[in-house]
């Protein structure tokens, strides 16, 4: 993928405002809360995948991995193929959860009995519903759960889990952790993520994801909130995030650039 061209400082600032907000992080600094389970929702962002495995291993709690084969699974296949260590894992035709379970077991030495696999879900709503069903079947008492997801989908995922368990008297306490907070900056040869890391989105895909995410989070007729599709609980969108998103949508240089570069 060629380097993403230069963007204005104003546009970069708006991108990072939206991206930081979407990557909901309920922690400051190190994770000091002891959980009863870590849920890793299937995605293709290697630092996020590694973060979930690291937490589960350090806390010695079950790692519930959720993800079947969906419209974005090919991005995970690509990420694994390009990774210098994980590329030995077989991907073609396999569910996301099966692939991520191999990473957790083979590379993070998480015992098989501590890896719970949900390999039927194909979207965010099913990730939440099917994961909650597995938790309800667990012999262990699950009170506190750390949910880890692609940072661009982290806030929506949390709102989805809260919607699924809205009417449950003893629902777990959901805590959100995206693994890292994405940030774009102008580099000497174009725009890129800082700090650099393996297994991230292309800049084009990242921008497409974050600009497409806010309409889903709205609580209106077209959104996913209670007044729309009712997939998620109501989400308050801060004014600065809304303004930043509007700026990106009205930035013709950016939209033209994204349209000209196939994802």
Task: Please give the residue ranges for each predicted region.
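Active-site cores that bind ATP or allylic diphosphates and position pyrophosphate for catalysis
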Residues: 239, 246-248, 252-263
């Amino acid at each position: 993928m060629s380097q993403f061209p230069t963007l204005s400082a104003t546009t970069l600032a708006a991108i990072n405002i939206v991206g930081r907000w979407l990557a909901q992080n309920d922690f400051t600094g190190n994770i000091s809360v002891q959980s009863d389970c870590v849920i890793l929702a299937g995605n293709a962002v290697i630092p996020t995948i590694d973060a979930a495995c690291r937490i589960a291993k350090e806390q010695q709690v079950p790692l519930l991995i959720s993800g079947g084969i969906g419209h974005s699974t090919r991005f995970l296949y690509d990420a694994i193929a390009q990774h210098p260590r994980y590329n030995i894992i077989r991907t073609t035709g396999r569910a996301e959860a099966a692939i991520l379970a191999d990473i957790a077991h083979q590379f993070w030495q998480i015992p098989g009995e501590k890896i719970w696999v949900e390999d039927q879900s194909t979207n965010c709503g099913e990730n939440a519903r099917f994961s909650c069903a597995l938790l309800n079947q667990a012999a262990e008492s699950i009170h506190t759960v750390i949910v880890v997801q692609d940072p661009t989908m982290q806030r929506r995922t949390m709102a989805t889990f809260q919607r699924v368990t809205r009417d449950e008297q003893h629902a777990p306490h959901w805590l959100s952790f995206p693994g890292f907070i994405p940030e774009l900056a102008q580099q000497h040869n174009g725009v890129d993520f800082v700090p650099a890391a393996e297994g991230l989105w292309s800049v084009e895909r990242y921008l497409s994801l974050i600009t497409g995410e806010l309409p889903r989070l709205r609580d209106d007729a077209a959104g996913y909130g209670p007044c729309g599709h009712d997939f998620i609980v109501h989400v308050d969108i801060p004014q600065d995030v809304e303004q930043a998103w509007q700026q990106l949508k009205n930035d013709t240089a950016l939209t033209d650039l994204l349209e000209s570069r196939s994802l």
